[in-house]
Amino acid sequence: MKILIPTAKEMNTDLPSIEAIPLKPESQAVLDALALYSASQLESFYKVSAEKAAEEFQNIQALKRQTAQHYPALKLFDGLMYRNIKRDKLTEAEQDYLENHVFITSALYGVVPVLSPMAPHRLDFLMKLKVAGKTLKSHWKAAYDETLKKEEVIFSLLSSEFETVFSKEIRAKMVTFKFMEDRGGQLKIHSTISKKARGAFLTALIENQVQTVGEARRLNFAGFVYREDLSQPQGLVFVKEV
């Protein structure tokens, strides 16, 4: 069983660094394509300020020169979902569960264990980077599929732009999750609820060592409970009354 989570734009580098590992060929090809951009070209590529683009330029060049600082991915990313994941004071069993079951999907690194070393970078599958004439999705599809081809159960906490990197055969094995709030009988869903709930849900998976869909259905976390009436066999819905 594998659990897939996305990367995040927000990062925290106020952490002890760890040793880097060599980039996969697919990752090196992406980095080589990114490294062709000047700082001013990155400004329009990323749609960010000149200051932010200069920072990203330095990050890319540091990776290219192999001088970049690396951090455990789970702690480097610091978006809303990540801030709601239990990342510290893990028991040995929780640490093992993380290492064996939780994987990050990255447009630079591929599908990698959640504690893998990563350097600060900005890249997702909505960005129009061409790698040897291919889109990022086409470039990564075979490697993404290879990582999961032996898995029978895949829990996806990804957004659709990450899920569609995988082939239909792999996507057919994915169990997806929706998190909603019930406000006086009105069911609401928005990105803040979803991101916080994904983090809390992953924490519940880790703490309860969940291995099956049946075990996931029984979870109560952060006020959310499973709603069978709203769910499909491979699309679980959890609702929180507010």
From Swiss-Prot:
One of the record's GO cellular component terms: cytosol
One example of a Gene Ontology biological process annotation: response to hydroperoxide
InterPro entries in the record: YaaA
Signal peptide extent: none
Family matches, as Pfam families: H2O2_YaaD
Domain of life: Bacteria
Transmembrane segments: none
Family, as annotated: Belongs to the UPF0246 family.
Listed name of the protein: UPF0246 protein SPH_1662
Provenance organism: Streptococcus pneumoniae (strain Hungary19A-6)
